[in-house]
Amino acid sequence: MQGIIRLDKYLTHIGVNSRREAVKIIKAGKVKVNGKKVFDPAFKVNPEEDVVEVEGFRRIPFQEHFYYKFYKPKGYITSTKDKEPTIIELLPKDLPGLKRLFPAGRLDKDAEGLLILTTDGELAHRIMHPKWKLEKRYEVLLDKPITDSDIKKLEEGIELSSPCHAELPLLSPRAKRGVLHKEKTLPARIKVLAEDKKFLEVAVREGRYHLIKRMFGKLGYQVLSLKRIAIGPVRLGDLKPAEALPLSQEELENLKTLLGLK
């Protein structure tokens, strides 16, 4: 977003509050522009030149979009709103862009690991779209040792049957049409991480419903734990559960390059 904009819109854009709440904050005299209090929500500001300060929030530079990597703990829904606990509830209330953030993709409630949270709809769409075949890496713990022959099957791609009957109510009509037939998975990369051959690193380039669990389930294995450790060039690294960090410039540029946005 460039050029002159209203002050209340500016506050909404940086995630300080909703538009209605932003108006209340401004009228209450809690906002300064270039060191002076402003009471008019329609006051015009230049994001590239003016300094806007909001009482109770750290000074937040204006930017078009926000990009974070987030460690989703087990037990939370990958959604912005739900009856059950969601990832948004874990984020700091003064996180820049919070009101407009959404997850680019999902992780099951019982899974953990890396999510990308953003306000950039086009980037999120490309992360999730099968056309771009963005690699995602997981650490997977199985209930029993995997055989070399099964590793080879996964590396060549396997046919997945329809999801079990219990899963069907969870799917939208469109999603049901996408999984209610047999389709071969794209070749996966498998790396054995432990001598007992139960702990693996699995890299896939598609995001079908419960893909990892269904791949191993087809071969007779149960996934005991699932942790995503990378999405393309973005790594989970040393992030702690429920922690969010802005993507580095290098991470963002590399991600956009892979997704054809540069």
Regions found by a protein language model. Give the residues of each.
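Basic, flexible Lys/Arg- and Gly-enriched helix-loop patches that mediate nucleic-acid binding at interfaces
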Residues: Q2-H165, A175-K262
